[in-house]
Amino acid sequence: MSSPIKKVLFIEPRAPRPHIFSRVAIPRIGPVLLGTILERQGLEVKVIIEEIAAPDYRSLDFKPDLVCISSITSTAPRAYELGDFYRRQGLPVVMGGAHPSFVVRETLDHADYVICGEGDEALPELVAALNSGGDLGQIPNLAFLAGETLRQNPWRPFLEDLDSLPIPNYEVVHGWNARRGRRFVSIATSRGCPFNCRFCAVIKLFGRKYRYNSVDRVMEEIRQNGAKAHHIFFCDDNFTADRERIKKLCQRILQEKIKIEWSAQVRVEAAKDEEMMILMARAGCYCVFVGLESINPATLKLYNKSQTVEGIKDCVVNFHRHGIRVHGMFVFGSEEDHYQVIRDTVKFSRDLDLDSLQYLILTPIPGTPVYQELEAQNRIFCHDWSHYDGHHAVFQPRRLTPYELQFETIRAMKKFYSWTSVLKRLIARDWFYVKMKAGGRIQMWQSRWGKSNHVQQLKERLFSRVQQLRQWLPGSNYVPRVGIPADIWKLGPWESSHRDFLLRFLRHLGVEVVQETVVDKTENGPLSQVQAEIARLQEKADLILLPFWQGLEEAKQKIKDAHQQITHETVARLLDLEFSRESFYNACMELGLCFQKRLRRIRRIYFQTLAEVGAEI
């Protein structure tokens, strides 16, 4: 380092676009806590939470020696932009948070150092090493480039004594004093989670074991930060994990007569404890955020969720009975979800009278099991991190096209945040939720969410693929006879149910299916037999469909090459379509759009055929 580090700037980048909580700026606790730790060590610190107050960095009067940027996946592009800005000025940049922890190499294109996982100890050690010329290789959780070589140090054991950390000082937040009367503070009372939800990276970041602050320590933080705030958000991933501890905390709040309004994230099971709910309500609990996830039992099982649909109903009813509002969160797009699941969820939500909710799209966040699986299956088609906010389809679902998943989720949000729902809250004089629901509705209208570039791209992605397929159709789009070589099923792991389904599906689309088989099986294997069958189908079909199972590229090319040699003037053209367990529905929609124009009708035919076959597809 050319000069010692005396002033450190922390930045929490803004979300890429407005969201339901845009008007309720709740700072993430990480930058504030880390800033407080460095402040206690004698450094001058400023924390910028861009959703609270975003300055013009070119004219910012605070001139840092080190810049620390925290990022989740959806804010990564903004974090990269800020990192590049300060590096051009010759300042060292550190990045941390959930996204950099799992996308280390990419992040180091925009930062000098990455702190993976918890930074409570790693960041002070890094600052000390930079000031003294210490060995960076000895700092656990740190990653950096040594020339072109990535150096990624092992992670340290998780910090057990959370009480040893200082109480976050929100006075270091830029623009904080201007928010008197509108202050929302975050308080963390625990870290870790034993529940292995497949779309969540908490276990990798904070461990499987719960680690708690003592009730005394939490009370001290409430007195210091919460009493001066309009609202406290307990940002634990599962606030009520230890119910007896929460009962003690609520009792202490009541005993000390602290008047606060607060909210927290809880699991469905929390509503089974009557005593705890009574104490929470009396101690000022305004709202709970509950991961309801799905009303599809198969999806709940897939997400590793133990809750049931009846349990979800009881949860909402029980919290409402104690005057506690419920913000529900559903996630669409699992391997078991289809369009009707989404529509049934909307009806379920409205019947349940949830106060507010988010219909989220399953998002493969780096570091999660879902990301690893979808990436390995090559099903992620969008790597624009700004779209990884739970509101954009970025992968190919199994039982929906990406466009359908996006369209149905937008439709669901519009249904829930309707003007009728706003009027209902207005009649009840529930002013906070009047603002929230009206704001949500206006926000969707202002942002033209349903006509966003991403939605249009998904639509174009589907229909451009269909246009590519249609170019193989003869003359007009109407194809009365489609030929399928009978032995093509032997080229892949086609089960009889899949084969039966596809043939029925084509017939329901109004297509006559012609199959040709080679009588003389002395041909050299199924590939040669298929080539012979294609030759025989030339004069019997207008189009020859080759349904290939995924991974048969070599066989596909050999057949197409052989076909070109069969005839000079192609009587029937070859249409090859790739199928797999994960893409079967999508392939059927593409195939259907070759013969029918309305996606809704094709979808109805698909599910009608599924009912006829009576087998898992």
Regions found by a protein language model. Name each.
Residues 17-18, 147, 195, 244, ...:
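Flexible glycine/acidic-rich beta-alpha junction loops that bind and position SAM and/or redox cofactors
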Residues 17-31, 491-498:
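Glycine- and acidic-residue-enriched helix-capping/strand-helix junction motifs
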